[in-house]
């Protein structure tokens, strides 16, 4: 794990976390915020700069948190919002669509088109890696 690989809890973090990668900074900031006792969590691009394995772990933690607390998740990666109770799709600075993933997909609007395009890109990327 990150902690063990970097000297454990004795690791010294430089000013502005200059000795951490972008992904490490993101994970550390998220860990600090998720351990705080809050009623509402607002996570803006919580998995940006994160590898896919870490993203899956983070999203599982967010899903578990959402069972007990209010979570507002802002994400350009629509696969992360699929399990949300309510999805607000934004366009030109306003709410263009609102509903569950299933309802938004059934409507065939902008959310459905963007989700399908992202899914096709990700599947193509995975095939290229194999």
What are these regions (language model features)?
Residues 55-67:
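Helical segment within the ABC ATPase nucleotide-binding domain
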Residues 88, 92-96, 100-103:
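Conserved switch/coupling elements of ABC/ABC-like ATPase nucleotide-binding domains
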């Amino acid at each position: 794990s990150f902690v063990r690989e970097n000297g454990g809890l004795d690791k010294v973090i430089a000013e502005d976390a200059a000795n951490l990668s972008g992904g490490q900074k993101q994970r550390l900031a998220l860990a600090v915020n998720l351990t705080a006792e809050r009623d509402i969590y607002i996570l803006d691009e919580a998995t940006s700069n994160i590898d896919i394995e870490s993203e899956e772990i983070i999203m599982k933690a967010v899903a578990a948190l959402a069972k007990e607390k209010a979570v507002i998740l802002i994400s350009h990666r629509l696969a992360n919002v699929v399990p949300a109770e309510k999805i607000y799709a934004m366009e030109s600075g306003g709410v263009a669509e609102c509903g569950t993933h299933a309802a938004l997909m059934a409507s065939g609007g902008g959310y459905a088109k963007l989700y399908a395009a992202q899914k096709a890109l990700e599947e193509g990327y995975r095939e290229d890696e194999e």
